[in-house]
Amino acid sequence: MQNYSEEGLQYHLNIRKGDVGKYVILPGDPKRCAKIAEHFEDAKLVADNREYVTYTGYLDGEKVSVTSTGIGGPSASIALEELVRSGADTFVRVGTCGGIDIDVKGGDIVIATGAIRTEGTTREYAPIEFPAVANYDVVTALLQAGKKLGYTTHAGIVQCKDSFYGQHEPEVMPVSYELQQKWEAWKRLRVKASEMESAALFVVASHLGVRVGSTFLVVGNQERNAAGLENPIVHDTEAAITVAVQALRNLIAQDRQNA
C-alpha cells in the first residue's frame, strides 16, 4: 500500500506505535472521548483528526486509550485497522442504540453477542455467510461489569444498519417493503437493539485476530412506544461508559492472571 502520510503515522488517526495502549474504548462521538478519559489516570490528548480523537492514559497501572470512530461501519473499520497497526488488540465499543425487543427499555444496557450484517462494510471483508460475533472474553467482562454496577442489562444479537432514518422512517424509503418486512423478522427473532458499528467491528476483528465487544445505552424503544408501554427516553451515556471502563479493568486483571 502506498504511504500517504508521515512515516509510521497512521493516515486517518494520526497516531503511531507507542501512542496507544493494548486496551482501547471505542465511542462513536469524538466529544465523548474526553468524558471517557476522565476515568483514566494521567490521560493526555494524543491526536485529533477528522472524526478521530484519541486520548491515552492508565487504568490499574495498564496503558489504555480511547479513540472515537465516527458513525457507521466504514469509519469504524478504519479506526480498528489503524489502532491494531499501532499496537492495540482489545477493544470495547461504547455508544447508544434503539431497543427492538419489547423488554428492552430506555436507560437499560445492551451487550452485543453478535450483530446482523445489514450494512455494507463487512461485505468487503467476508462472505455474507460469515457471522459477526463478539469476542467471548470481552462479552464476559462486560456482563460481569453490568452485574457489578447493578444496571439492567440485556445480552444478545443487535441489528447493524447503514441508514438511521431507514429504521425510524422506513415507510418513506423506496425500499420500505424490504425494511419493514425485515424489521418484523428482527422482532420475531428477539433481536435486542439496533445500532450502526458492531457488525463491522466484529468482522474486522475476526479478520485481524483481535478482541472486540460492544455495550450500549438504550436511548428508547420505538416498539414499546407503539405498544403503548412505558418508554423513557435517556441520553446520558455515563452508565454505558462505566460498564465499558469496568470491563477493561476486568480484562486487564484476567489477562494478568493468565500471563
What do these predicted regions represent?
Residues 1-141:
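Metabolite-binding pocket within alpha/beta catalytic cores that recognizes anionic/polar moieties
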Residues 43-48, 150-157, 253-259:
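Flexible, glycine/charged-enriched surface loops at secondary-structure junctions
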Residues 141-149, 204, 243-254:
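Generic non-transmembrane alpha-helical segments
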